[in-house]
């Protein structure tokens, strides 16, 4: 169903009910662009740390506008073995609510706009009929404006001037006294004749304040004063003769109108709050940008630090699942060879997967997957949910006896919760939203700085004696170079000691230099370095999320051998994480390599001397696939000891702990 400003108020209750009834919710967003500076390859460097990737996206992607948001709710009908789906396609545009409301500025990227236009995107519908929104800070400011205005009407005094003490009459500036005198004369005439209302000429906001103050102090009873707007959007004062009861009634009506106006201004943010308040599983595809934009646009400014962002994100969306990451992990990675949304949907309609049966209630627009309305946010959210169901049900085939339906609340899905796919990062497959991120070994990586004129071929020439290498550009004058063997690092460092045109650092030295730069931008407190404080955002308990803390390349080359070939002695509690060769054609901007591997699924372990742990009561036994590997569920401390012990194993490109 298409939702615009014209039908949003009517559809909102249905959206909220669908969210409350859903087993899970899938989302998708369309943006006016991706990067305002770096190329996509520089924005998504293969050796970014999670902190670096977050900082880049926060700095270079948040000035674009999320202007179409898709929501699809899925509720499983046990009797019919069918999913009831309700898809909503929201057009969003930050139309200023009033002269004092935020006037949002955003940027567009021509390639993104051109692509959406080629897909039939209706830009007119966005700009003419887009649903407005306010984040929580903006909503609080608007409420304060209403309270201030109401206080001025009741004689509390305006901001720009102060009534003299004890007189009860406001202090009118000399240049406005003639204007106020003429208003008083017109009011006196109104009180003497039979007219019921008086419309004054349009005037400035300051003059309207003076009128409110003067009439409130001089005529405390018998008059109702209200600011209205002409067809030309000009504001004027209307004065009406009323008794006390009528005045109270009109004041109540005005407050109700203001509350409705405020709700209209909050707009689409109410949908996000409903989803957040529900606590339901939120599913997306390659959803890091979707989550960042959603929080930034509808909740509040993104914190500077990654850990603060994780805390905020987990407050807004307690459970997230990324289908791109799910498709890239065991047991799917050996079957699924292309994890783009369209291709993933096609592959999951074939054996060994089974597409789910869905049904759309009468009166709601349903999507036909045969028409492939890709890059319409509502449709993309719909097929993202279908992909999730197909993969979740496939996990049921590993149970004994096999189950054809796996609930969105099943513990079989817990390994995939709150892990968002990291695009093109070679050795860190996901961003762990609910815990510390993986820290791969990068002893074989060098950081090279060089003149701006250098090309990728120059770097390959420089390191030609070291065999296969991989180049990951950072910017125009620096890049990471991954060597095939760690032992070669010292040789490269010694060789470059007296070089004048370039400089080489180990990856550890590179990190140290970045930390020094970070310290230099921090303040010195009495107890040491202190981060610059991040402004807190007022959070209302009425919303679904309340956060009281601070709101926070270019020739064909292959990387090192897979971990299977390098780390035969790895501990059993660690996974076999394979790495596919990454090939590039032409310039680095044409590199499109997804890490096609992740943690083996499933691998359960039991407490020492205890029974094996079943995922859920109805899914009591794992089949032979997992039973042969199952040794019981260990405590977190025990897992940490295993993690530390693994460092004594032969060096690998990276080590990925299992997610169970």
UniProtKB/Swiss-Prot annotation:
Q: Which cysteines are disulphide-bonded?
A: none
Listed Basic residues bias regions: 633-642
What keywords sit in the KW lines?
A: Cytoplasm, Exonuclease, Hydrolase, Metal-binding, Nuclease, Nucleus, Phosphoprotein, RNA-binding
What does the record give as cofactor?
A: a divalent metal cation
Write down a Pfam family by its short name. Answer: RNA_bind
Q: Where is the signal peptide?
A: none
Binding residues for a divalent metal cation, per the UniProt record? 28, 30, 290, 380
* Annotated InterPro entries: CAF1_poly(A)_ribonucleases (IPR051181), Nucleotide-bd_a/b_plait_sf (IPR012677), PARN_R3H (IPR034042), PolyA-riboNase_RNA-binding (IPR014789), R3H_dom (IPR001374), R3H_dom_sf (IPR036867), RBD_domain_sf (IPR035979), RNase_CAF1 (IPR006941)
Q: Which residues carry this modification: Phosphothreonine?
A: 649
Tell me where in this chain the R3H domain is found. Answer: 177-243
The name on file for this protein is Poly(A)-specific ribonuclease PARN
Subcellular location per the Swiss-Prot or TrEMBL entry: Cytoplasm; Nucleus
Q: What biological-process GO terms show up in the record?
A: hemopoiesis; nuclear-transcribed mRNA poly(A) tail shortening; priRNA 3'-end processing; siRNA 3'-end processing
- Site (Interaction with poly(A)) found at 324
Q: State what this protein does.
A: 3'-exoribonuclease that has a preference for poly(A) tails of mRNAs, thereby efficiently degrading poly(A) tails. Exonucleolytic degradation of the poly(A) tail is often the first step in the decay of eukaryotic mRNAs and is also used to silence certain maternal mRNAs translationally during oocyte maturation and early embryonic development.
The record's catalysed reaction(s) read: Exonucleolytic cleavage of poly(A) to 5'-AMP
Region ranges (Disordered): 606-660
């Amino acid at each position: 169903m298409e939702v615009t400003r014209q039908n949003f108020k009517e559809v909102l209750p249905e959206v909220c009910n669908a969210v409350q009834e859903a087993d899970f919710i899938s989302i998708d967003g369309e943006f006016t662009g991706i990067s305002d500076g770096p190329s996509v390859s520089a924005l998504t460097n293969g050796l970014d740390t999670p902190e670096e990737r977050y900082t880049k996206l926060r700095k270079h992607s948040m000035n674009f506008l999320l202007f179409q948001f898709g929501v699809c709710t899925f509720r499983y009908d046990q009797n019919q073995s069918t999913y009831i789906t309700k898809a909503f396609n929201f057009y969003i545009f930050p139309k200023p609510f009033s002269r004092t409301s935020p006037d949002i500025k955003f940027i567009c990227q021509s390639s993104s706009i051109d692509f959406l236009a080629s897909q039939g995107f209706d830009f007119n519908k966005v700009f003419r009929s887009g649903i407005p929104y306010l984040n929580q800070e903006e909503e609080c400011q608007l409420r304060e404006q209403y309270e201030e205005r109401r206080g001025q009407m009741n004689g509390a005094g305006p901001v720009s001037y102060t009534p003299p003490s004890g007189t009860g009459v406001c202090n009118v500036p000399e240049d406005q006294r003639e204007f106020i005198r003429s208003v008083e004369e017109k009011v006196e005439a109104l009180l003497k004749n039979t007219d019921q209302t008086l419309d004054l000429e349009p005037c400035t906001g300051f003059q309207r304040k003076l009128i409110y103050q003067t009439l409130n102090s001089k005529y405390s009873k018998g008059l109702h004063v209200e600011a209205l707007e002409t067809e030309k959007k000009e504001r004027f004062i209307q004065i009406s003769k009323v008794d006390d009861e009528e005045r109270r009634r009109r004041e109540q009506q005005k407050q109700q109108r203001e509350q409705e106006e405020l709700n209209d201004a909050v707009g689409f943010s109410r949908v996000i709050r409903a989803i957040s308040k529900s606590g339901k599983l939120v599913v997306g595809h390659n959803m890091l940008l979707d989550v960042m934009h959603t929080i930034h646009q509808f909740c509040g400014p993104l914190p500077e630090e990654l850990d603060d962002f994780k805390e905020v994100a987990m407050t807004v969306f307690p459970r997230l699942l990324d289908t791109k990451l799910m498709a890239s992990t065991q047991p799917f990675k050996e079957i699924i060879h292309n994890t783009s949304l369209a291709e993933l949907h096609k592959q999951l309609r074939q054996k060994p997967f089974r597409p789910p049966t869905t049904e759309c209630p009468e009166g709601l627009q349903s999507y036909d997957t045969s028409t492939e309305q890709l890059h319409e946010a509502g449709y993309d959210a719909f097929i993202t949910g279908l992909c999730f169901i197909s993969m979740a049900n496939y996990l049921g085939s590993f149970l004994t006896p096999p189950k054809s339906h796996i609930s969105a609340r099943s513990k079989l899905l817990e390994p995939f919760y709150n892990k968002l796919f990291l695009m093109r990062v070679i050795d860190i497959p996901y961003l762990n939203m609910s815990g510390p991120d993986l820290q791969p070994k990068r002893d074989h990586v060098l950081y090279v700085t060089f003149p701006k004129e250098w090309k990728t071929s120059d770097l390959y020439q420089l390191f030609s004696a070291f065999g296969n290498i991989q180049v990951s550009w950072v910017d125009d004058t620096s890049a990471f170079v991954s060597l095939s063997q760690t032992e070669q690092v010292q040789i490269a460092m010694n060789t470059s000691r007296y070089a004048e045109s370039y400089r080489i650092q180990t990856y550890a030295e590179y990190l140290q230099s970045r930390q020094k730069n970070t310290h230099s931008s921090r303040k010195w407190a009495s107890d040491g370095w202190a981060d610059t404080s991040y402004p807190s955002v007022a959070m209302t308990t009425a919303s679904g999320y309340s956060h009281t803390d601070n709101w926070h390349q270019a020739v064909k080359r292959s990387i090192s051998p897979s971990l299977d070939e390098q780390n035969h002695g790895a501990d059993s509690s660690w996974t076999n994480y394979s790495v596919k060769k990454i090939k590039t054609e032409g310039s680095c901007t044409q590199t499109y390599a997804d890490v096609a591997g992740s943690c083996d699924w499933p691998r359960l372990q039991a407490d020492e001397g205890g029974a094996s742990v079943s995922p859920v009561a109805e899914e009591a036994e794992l089949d032979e696939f997992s039973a042969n590997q199952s040794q019981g569920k260990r405590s977190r401390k025990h897992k940490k000891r295993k993690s530390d012990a693994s460092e004594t194993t032969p060096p690998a490109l990276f080590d990925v702990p299992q997610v169970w």
